[in-house]
C-alpha cells in the first residue's frame, strides 16, 4: 500500500484509524519510517560504566550490541555475524574485549571490526577483506544526561533537538537532580498488543486512572486513592499536558501526586525530594524545581516511557502488529540512600513489572484495543482523542511546547499521533520536516475545520 497520501490520523491528531493497532502491512511500513528513522532508547551509562561493558538492546525488531569503548565512548552494532547471519551475542549483558560467533568462530572486536577468522590464510588466502566485514554500526549514538539513544538515520536531528520542548520538563529530573541511575536487568514480558497502545497510554493519559486502576488505588494510601472509580476529578490546577514537534510529550501531575505508584514509600520519597527541592528552588527556579518533585508520565517518541518519581522506565519493543515485548527498569537518583533505591526498584517491579498489579490493569485494555484493530468491521472506525481540544496553547510564557493546562486531557495524544502521521506519510526526514512546518498551528486550532 502507498501510505504517502493515506490518512491514518486526522489533522490536529483528533482521530486515528483503528487499524493502526492491528494492520501487519502497516507495521512493516512502520519499521521503515518509525524504527529506522527515529531515536530509540538503548541503555544508560550506569549499566555499562567500564570499557568492555556491553548490553544487548532492541531497535525496532532488530537486536543490537551496545558497548563501552576503551576511550569511554559508546558504540552500537547489529547483533548479527557478518558471515552467515547468526546472532552473535546471546547474553543480555557482560564485559568482553570482543565477540566470537559460535557458528564458524569469526571474532569481532568491541569496536565492531572483524579481527579473526579460523584458518583464514589456509581457506581464504588473500581474498578476505576483513576491513569491509565489520559489524553493521548504528549510525548515531547520543546521550541525554546518561540515557543513551541510537538512530540508524544520519539525517535525523540531534537527540537534544529531537526531544525538543519535552527536554525542558525532563531536565530538572534527569540533570539537575544530580543524576539518575537505571536499575537492571529489565523485567520482560510479552503482551498481545500493538506497541503504540502502551506508548500512548504513558504519553499522558490520566483520564483512565480512576476506572482502570480503581482496585489498585484502593489497596494503598496516597493522594490519588480518592480517584478510585472516578469518584472525584483532580482539582483545577493539579497538572498540565504538553507535546512537541517530534511527538514526545507528557502529563505533569504537580507536587503530592508524585508517589502514587509506590504508596508505601511516599513518606520517604516526599522527605528526600522535599529537601532537594528547596535547594533546586535557588539553583534553577521555582517552576523547574516544582517539576523535579512532580509526577511526569512521559513518552519519548516512539516507544520509550517514564513515570518519574514512581521510578518506572519502560521500553515498548515491537514484535509484530499485535505483539510487544515490554522491558521495565527502575530509575533512581544517584544520591538516594541505598536502601531507598532498593525499595523503590522493588516497588517498580511490584506495580509495573511483568506481574505488577498496575501493569495487569493496563494490559487488558491495551490487548483488546489492539486486537480489535485487525477485525473487519472495527478496523476502519475512528478512535477519538479530542479531550481538551481547542484549549491548547503554544508560546506560553512559562511552559514550552503545545500545552493544555489540565491534568486530564489528550493534548499529548494528539501530538504523538500528528508526528506518527507525518512519519508514515514521509519517505525521509526532509519530507517529515515539510509536513511538520505548521505543527503547533495544527495542534492549537480551536475548531476541527
Swiss-Prot record:
Residue ranges annotated for the Rieske domain, each copy included: 39-137
Documented EC number(s): 1.14.12.12
Single annotated GO MF: iron ion binding
Keywords: 2Fe-2S, Aromatic hydrocarbons catabolism, Dioxygenase, Iron, Iron-sulfur, Metal-binding, NAD, Oxidoreductase, Plasmid
Disulfide bonds: none
Cofactor mode of binding and number, as noted: Binds 1 [2Fe-2S] cluster per subunit. Binds 1 Fe(2+) ion per subunit.
The protein's required cofactors: [2Fe-2S] cluster; Fe(2+)
InterPro entries xref list: RHO_NdoB-like_C (IPR043266), Rieske_2Fe-2S (IPR017941), Rieske_2Fe-2S_sf (IPR036922), Ring-hydroxy_dOase_2Fe2S_BS (IPR015881), Ring_hydroxy_dOase_asu_C_dom (IPR015879), Rng_hydr_dOase-A (IPR001663)
Residues the entry annotates as binding [2Fe-2S] cluster: 81, 83, 101, 104
Positions with a binding annotation for Fe cation: 208, 213, 362
Gene3D superfamilies: Naphthalene 1,2-dioxygenase Alpha Subunit, Chain A, domain 1, Rieske [2Fe-2S] iron-sulphur domain
GO BP annotations, alphabetical order: catabolic process
Chemical reaction(s) catalysed: naphthalene + NADH + O2 + H(+) = (1R,2S)-1,2-dihydronaphthalene-1,2-diol + NAD(+)
One Pfam family matching this protein: Rieske
Pathway(s) per entry: Aromatic compound metabolism; naphthalene degradation
Quaternary state and interactors: The naphthalene dioxygenase (NDO) multicomponent enzyme system is composed of an electron transfer component and a dioxygenase component (iron sulfur protein (ISP)). The electron transfer component is composed of a ferredoxin reductase (NdoR) and a ferredoxin (NdoA), and the dioxygenase component is formed of a heterohexamer (trimer of heterodimers) of three large alpha subunits (NdoB) and three small beta subunits (NdoC).
Family of this protein: Belongs to the bacterial ring-hydroxylating dioxygenase alpha subunit family.
Function noted in UniProt: Component of the naphthalene dioxygenase (NDO) multicomponent enzyme system which catalyzes the incorporation of both atoms of molecular oxygen into naphthalene to form cis-(1R,2S)-dihydroxy-1,2-dihydronaphthalene. The alpha subunit has a catalytic role in the holoenzyme.
Protein name: Naphthalene 1,2-dioxygenase system, large oxygenase component
Gene assigned in the entry: ndoB
